[in-house]
């Protein structure tokens, strides 16, 4: 595993207001000591959730969601992992939510290879003009203003040299489904 960095990307937990906890099947997969970095798109919403993330990885980066109790989280953050500059934002600043042009503008402003945003509670990962965009969805499957039927999801990025292999974990019914997406830095 030399040269690999495992990055957990998740957000919109909304614990305890909309959900009690992460799905048990996700917790089983998230074992301490395997993950180097955590990038969280916010809306945890409490210190307990933060403390849980700290048990999984030493390096935890969080941006503030519109429901977070901790107002000290920054609005945005740029983190470098290996050869990749990664921008992190909650996503309520993106108007309309998840809008491609707005996301691309943020990507250029932050000057990043990968832009991670949340807020919509809907998983997405795609390449646009040689940059990579990820929305990890809601790790608990919390409802949002527009949608009550949300599939719980999180993302693991395996970063090695100039390649990121993104694994998306979705809890569909009782089964965890995994999808793999590869992005190479041009």
Curated annotation (Swiss-Prot):
One of its GO terms (molecular function) is metal ion binding. Keywords: Acetylation, Cytoplasm, Endosome, Membrane, Metal-binding, Protein transport, Transport, Zinc. It is found in: Cytoplasm; Membrane; Endosome membrane; Early endosome. The modification N6-acetyllysine is found at residue 54. This is Vacuolar protein sorting-associated protein 29. GO terms for cellular component: cytosol; early endosome; endosome; endosome membrane; late endosome; retromer complex. The keyword Zinc applies. Belongs to the VPS29 family. Component of the commander complex that is essential for endosomal recycling of transmembrane cargos; the commander complex is composed of the CCC subcomplex and the retriever subcomplex. Component of the retriever complex, which is a heterotrimeric complex related to retromer cargo-selective complex (CSC) and essential for retromer-independent retrieval and recycling of numerous cargos such as integrin alpha-5/beta-1 (ITGA5:ITGB1). Component of the retromer cargo-selective complex (CSC). Coiled coil: none annotated. SUPFAM superfamilies: Metallo-dependent phosphatases. InterPro entries: Calcineurin-like_PHP_lpxH, Metallo-depent_PP-like, Phosphodiesterase_MJ0936/Vps29, Vps29. One of its GO terms (biological process) is endocytic recycling. Component of the commander complex consisting of the CCC subcomplex and the retriever subcomplex. Component of the heterotrimeric retriever complex formed by VPS26C, VPS29 and VPS35L; within the complex interacts with VPS35L. Component of the heterotrimeric retromer cargo-selective complex (CSC), also described as vacuolar protein sorting subcomplex (VPS), formed by VPS26 (VPS26A or VPS26B), VPS29 and VPS35. The CSC has a highly elongated structure with VPS26 and VPS29 binding independently at opposite distal ends of VPS35 as central platform. NCBIfam families: yfcE. Gene3D superfamilies: 3.60.21.10. It comes from Bos taurus.
